Regions:
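Thiamine diphosphate
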Residues: 1-149
Length: 149
């Protein structure tokens, strides 16, 4: 009975897009928001930040499906905003609709995701969380209140 929203990049969505069949088979309403930058974004970002821009197998410009048509092939709803003005109406429609929905949000190819964990680092050493630095005492406290950050 709760609203369920899946936020995914286009690369990760393609790793489990067959689950659209599960949504249809069990009549589950999930709003799938795909942030589509036409590449394996986190892998590309790692290669950009840590491997001197030696890009390998991250470009999806010529190998991605039309996600709207893919949703419709499963009998689900599919939307792709063409302008910023379309976004609010599409989201409103998806929330009101009884069917599962795929929304393909176009993003800039170079757009990065923050925070990110550098290679070999722990989740406690994320980059891009300057305002969320934990003290060693907070790291040891299992019931740490993130509202204090």
């Amino acid at each position: 009975d709760e609203l369920v929203v899946n936020i995914s990049g286009d690369g990760s969505f393609q790793m489990c897009q067959q689950e659209l069949g599960t949504l249809k088979a069990y009549d589950l309403k999930v709003i799938n928001c795909i942030f589509n930058n036409k590449n394996l974004g986190m892998v590309r970002q790692w290669q950009d930040l840590f491997y001197d821009k030696h890009y390998s197998h991250v470009d999806l410009k010529h190998g991605s499906p039309d996600f709207v048509l893919l949703a419709e092939a499963y009998g689900l709803r599919g939307h792709k905003p063409e302008t910023r003005a379309d976004v609010d109406e599409i989201i409103k429609t998806a929330i009101e609709d009884e069917a599962a929905t795929v929304i393909d949000f176009p993003m800039a190819y170079e757009m990065n995701v923050w925070p990110i964990v550098p290679p070999g680092a722990s989740n406690m050493d994320m980059m891009g969380v300057d305002n969320c630095t934990l003290t060693s005492k907070q790291r040891e406290t299992p019931d740490f209140d993130w509202e204090q950050v």
